[in-house]
């Protein structure tokens, strides 16, 4: 199902652009930064509710799809869509976005605008991860999440925040290299970056195992999953 109104793009870019607005508020207007962040997170959550209620559970096809050429020289598209698995994850993401703003309302007292902007940015990027149908678009959203996560750990982390930040960056970077290799391999073999077309592409069992390990390395660090959680 393709919609006239790009609801998925709205869910992605509302918190991302909202993060820029909150960041522009400045350090000395913390109360305004909190209120704006709550409004933006609340509106994003309401949008996700309309996505959830408008989802047709009688079909397994991708819904609310959007498709626009992005980097035509490499057949990369701005392609979005959701299925019955990704819709609840988007709803959960936007719900937690509201909770994060509320949880940091009194706890975060320094650089409030930066803190709120980081989480709004992360929220939009996570929605992008759950709705991307182009592998490079997915990779861009997935890796861009490293930026706000890196800043949050480095600026508001515990006593060992510098060590934790460096370790997190190295782990994530290493895992991302394995994923990128896997994505490039799939593109070379299939001639497309479309994740939906990859579903239909035949691969040898050994190749599937190696690709699984590459993607597992990237996802394990971001989740984080034992034994790379510390």
Region locations from a protein language model:
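Hydrophobic alpha-helical transmembrane segments of multi-pass membrane proteins
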Residues: 82, 92, 170, 213-220
